[in-house]
């Protein structure tokens, strides 16, 4: 499930730090991963939320990545079928 990393926009010196993962939905059908975007000096410049949803009926998967900056502005918002 690392194909979403190609959709995130990182500046030079920035990297992703995994914060936490959890499942949600009435049948735990959606996996959510939260990341911080960290500069080389250790300060946080944004956040990334990745969701991997498996439809209960049909078992289709939809991936969604949302990247925001420190002000909350959306930098990336993409969804696709896996």
Which residues are covered by each model-predicted region?
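Eukaryotic scaffold repeat domains enriched in small/polar residues
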Residues: 1-82
């Amino acid at each position: 499930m690392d194909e979403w990393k190609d959709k995130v926009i990182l500046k030079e010196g920035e990297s992703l730090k995994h914060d936490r993962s959890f499942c949600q939905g009435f049948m735990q059908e959606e996996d959510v991963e939260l990341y911080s975007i960290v500069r080389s000096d250790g300060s946080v410049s944004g956040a990334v939320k990745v969701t991997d949803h498996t439809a209960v009926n049909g078992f289709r998967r939809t991936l969604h990545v949302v990247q925001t900056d420190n002000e909350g502005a959306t930098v990336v918002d993409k969804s696709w079928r896996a």
